[in-house]
Amino acid sequence: MDFEHIPVLFNDTVNSLEIKPDGLYVDCTAGGGGHSHAVAQRLSDKGRLIAIDRDPEAIEVLKARFASFPNVEIVHNTFDNISAILNGRKADGIMADLGVSSHQIDTAERGFSFHMDAPLDMRMSKEGKSAADVVNTYSENELYRIIRDYGEERYAKSIAKNIVK
């Protein structure tokens, strides 16, 4: 599977970690592994990288990409569980490229892009309700609250009303 993603601020991000060869680093949103790969290449045998992602497709790509890196730990989880993932270990550096990845936007089946004719999904993984489920089953008030609170949209009431029409 091709998991093309253009990392944001690639060099700035990796350089700001000031990587120590024997350090412990965490990529909270590993995706296709671009940032992770740059970190892993700078580690010695004593160094460790933990690459976390919630997307099962990304996890498969990461497992293949880092198969020859024994000091890279691939974790299928969300970054909000970082304390449990670290399990008492102290990280020397943590990075997170938050948001939707290029791969997710460019893959029609993921349902993130309005440029392609595909079902409305918009999930980071296949767990939970799709965006289509939400807009087709939630009440106008529920949609209004979501759009207002998470989208910070001043026309949330009008948008919710038009969705349920």
Residue ranges and their predicted role:
Residues 1-165:
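S-adenosyl-L-methionine-dependent methyltransferase catalytic core, i.e., the SAM/SAH-binding region
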